[in-house]
Amino acid sequence: MSVYDVVIVGSGASGGAVAYTLCKAGYKVAVLEKGRLINREEFSKDELAYSRRDLVTPNLFDEYHTIEEKIEGEWVTTPTYESGWSFWNGNIVGGSSNLMSGMLHRLHPDDFRLKSKYGEIKGANVVDWPISYDDMEPYYALTEELVGISGKVDKHPFEPPRSTADFTQPPTKENAVVKLFDKSCKALDITPLVTPRAVLSRNKPGRDACYYSNLCGSYGCSSGAKGSSREALLKPALSTGNLTLLSNTYVKYLHSDNKDEVNHAVVVDTVTGKEKEIKGKIFVVAAQAHESARLLLNSASEHHPDGLGNSSGEVGKNLIFSGGGSGQGELHKETLKHIKFKELMTTGLFVNRSILDWYFIDHWWDGTFKGGSVEFMFEHQNIISRARKNGYEEGKLVWGKDLGERLVSRFTEQKSIRFEVFNDWLPNDDCFVSLDPTHKDKFGMPVGKLRLEGHPQDVKVGNYIAKKCEEVLEEMGAKNIYSSVSSSPPQNLVAGGCRFGNDPKTSVLNKYCRSHDVKNLFVADASFMPTGGSVAYTWTIYANAFRVADHIVKQLQKS
């Protein structure tokens, strides 16, 4: 049986970054991915496949989670095959990085020291990170170049410092609506920023620039422009000859022969059903935060009775999501100002605008507290989801001629512009993942049970920013403006569960994301994050995984 230098569980952003670095350094790497390989040319823009079918995620009757929510003061557990609330995100080679919208920001230096900046927050388990922004910055820059992030550096008081003057990839093409948006923001004394995006505006070797298909977020990319782990990292890693990519490989648990070392992974071929062992010198878990914690808990043994690497009892604890919410307004043909309606209706081009003005809030009336960021975009262009929004009016079903007229109007006489608010989801004692005592997946392993409870501050911040965004849409002349902020978590933005820190009693990982308990075990996905910042996690996930990979190279060189 082959013994790999490094075995990586998961092929998403973090798994790809570690694999790329190790393969380029000459080490033999195995990547274990539960899902199948979908090649670039197979990514279609099929609305049915992506909105109504299980194309890139497991069927919920085969693999699922159970969700604990507080209802009328009582914790109620529901399996997701009943609720339809899926916490799977892109179970294919490259993971959910294949399907992201790619709107990325770096964390701010103060995100690494939230407790020092704001002190204790009642009901929240906020801690400072064991590293600083300066430790991460070189890897943000590396991600920008290797993954391919397009953008433009705009001067802003909350823009993190950079080691490079600007992006090497200029911004992607923009819809004319940005003229109206920028003008409206300036009228309100708000600074509009060009959104950094993991989408190529120019060709890179082996990858073509964006062709503006109009179907980007939630869809795979058929040009290679999107900065997925599969395109940007795994394909170059495969070309080294050092990577063994094992798709359709479900990892049941990690086996340890002694207390401080993992020996092998026990896996199942999801096509044949055959079980086997994969041996390695170092193991890297990168299966997405809640699933990484579940894997460690399912890897309990006589040496690790409470779960692998869980002497602290912290595995699965302090799960975090992204706080905030969303909203939108409609730009109508008859009331549109400053731009032509034909320009607005041009398909494929991005809105490409962010606002960071409320990232840190220090106001004489509203007070001082951590805020968040905002991304602006057109509503999702999947025609099915857009059409379904018109099926009801005042709670009554619309059908026949009335429905047809509503659809024609929606698709030809207006365009909806959306915003998404990202703010910290404060870690707390009632947001965690554990093993469900009764439910098991089709492979016989206990499923993850997610208790989902937010902190009141999350909703307060989300509402504060959403109201500001509504003012922007109002200034743009939008109609039917609304926003929705709640403590319900977005299932595509999950972090925490194996937080890193200097104290083995209160954290799972050290500052290099190596287990405090197990010397050859690393966790490289978003699990490490003790706090999430107020932006989407992906750029930070990539950057930290490159940082961790560099440390693994040094560890292998020493041995």
Task: Give the positions of each predicted feature.
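Conserved redox-cofactor binding core of oxidoreductases
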Residues: L55, D62-K70, W75-W85, N98, ...
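Residue-level detector of alpha-helix initiation sites
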Residues: I8, G12-A13, T172, H290, ...
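Glycine-rich loop(s) and the adjacent beta-strand/alpha-helix scaffold that form part
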Residues: K24, K28, G35-A49, T240, ...
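FAD cofactor-binding and catalytic pocket of flavoenzymes
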Residues: G73-S96, M100, R106-L107, D111, ...
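Short, hydrophobic/aromatic-rich segments at coil-to-beta transitions
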Residues: D260-V266, S416
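Alpha-helix N-cap/helix-initiation motif
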Residues: S11, N125, K226, G273-K276, ...
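A glycine-rich dinucleotide-binding beta-alpha-beta segment and adjacent secondary-structure elements
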Residues: V194-A198, A209-G217, K252-H255, R410-F432, ...
